[in-house]
């Protein structure tokens, strides 16, 4: 329930920012946006998220960073390439029932290196939808009990670019990111979360 409330607050806050920015943007503005850019857009961002499903039983949140390149292929359409780092933060003092009784332990942080590619399309100026897929590589698989070094990952996303002058933007996006199993025998070894990325973007 707490995770659902946090996710709802995150989505509502993002929607408020988007609508506020859109209201302040004049329809006669001549500011150049990335939707009409002829060059590559690079962005460097901070990522945060809230685990969902069984992952939320043992993990509080995730934090990390990423770099992304947006390569124009048509009007309003970009190919994206993204690489980053995610640390899924484990909860402390978890209780487990064993044959010898109840024990407490801390969940080990999951460290992932996701690499994704996809498409980004601007529906209207500044507002976009994006879809990416790729692989997430576990950097500490033995510490967290994974038997796979990588898993397939996909991430649908919506976002808004806030112009800050010239070819520079603040790019904010909300996504749902999900993976296949990191452990072949454990259905609950998927890493799924709702995420927020806030990045500084600039045109080359």
Which role fits each region the language model picked out?
Residues 22-82, 86, 191-197, 201-204:
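Short glycine/proline- and aromatic-enriched beta-strand/turn motifs that initiate or cap beta-hairpins
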Residues 42-46, 81-83, 117-119, 129-131, ...:
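Membrane-embedded beta-strand positions of outer-membrane beta-barrel proteins
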Residues 49-53, 86-90, 136-140, 177-181, ...:
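Structural signature of outer-membrane beta-barrel domains
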Residues 1-9:
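Bacterial N-terminal signal peptides that target proteins for export
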Residues 38-42, 59-63, 109-113, 144, ...:
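Residues that define the transmembrane beta-barrel architecture of outer-membrane proteins
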